Regions:
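Conserved, compact domain cores that house catalytic/ligand-binding motifs in diverse enzymes
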Residues: 2-70
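Flexible, glycine-rich linker and terminal segments associated
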Residues: 1-5, 40, 55, 59-194
């Protein structure tokens, strides 16, 4: 991909700046292992990364990544590790990314510091008669502001032929603790619309 970096994303529209080139290549090297190469190139910022996903039969999926960047801040590094297991009714996983202070990538502001780490754990359960449940824990550790610690859970089920309902709750445990609830209902209006 070749284009221009977006400026003030989320606040300005049609505001583009530096030219950039981004590329990714993923290749299945064996039946169990897939490798990936990713690069981001701007005039004063370059980032290259390697990643891999390995299927461990009867165990789960293990993933790992390493990236290095070069910019006005210097040379920065990032490493990521993850594991997930999933079957028809139960799933769980953990993942983390640890970055050096000088690491940069697309989407970061020039004055922004990379988080020390972003770690997540999740669990999910799908039942035939009682719907599906999930829970997630997220911890984002920053260098220049307070950490984010978030716990969330959700439930979804079908209500006969009437429709489906989903509920979720998210609790922010750091800073000004807040709780967010959501409730959604959807029903089929016809053969092709919902």
């Amino acid at each position: 991909e070749v284009g221009f970096a977006r400026r003030n994303f989320g606040t300005d529209s049609n505001n583009y700046g530096r030219p950039l080139a981004v590329g990714s290549h993923r290749l299945g090297l064996t039946e169990q292992f897939t490798g990936e190469l990713h690069g981001e190139f701007l005039d004063n910022q370059q980032t290259m990364g390697l990643g891999g996903v390995m299927l461990l039969p009867a165990v789960g999926v293990l993933s790992g990544s390493f990236a290095a960047s070069h910019s006005d801040k210097g040379v920065g590094r990032l490493v990521g590790l993850g594991f997930r297991r999933q079957n028809r009714s139960f799933s769980f996983g953990v993942n983390t990314q640890i970055a050096g202070q000088r690491f940069v990538k697309l989407g970061m502001q020039s004055e922004e510091l990379a988080p020390k780490h972003i770690s997540q754990a999740f669990v999910g359960l799908a039942t035939t008669d009682y719907g599906s449940f999930s829970a997630r824990f997220t911890h984002q550790a920053f260098r220049d502001k307070e950490d984010n610690v978030i716990v969330s859970g959700s439930f979804a089920t079908q209500i006969g032929s009437l429709g489906s309902v989903s509920m979720s709750v998210m609790r922010f445990l750091s800073g000004d603790t807040q709780t967010v609830f959501s409730l959604n209902f959807s029903m089929l209006l016809g053969n092709r619309t919902a």
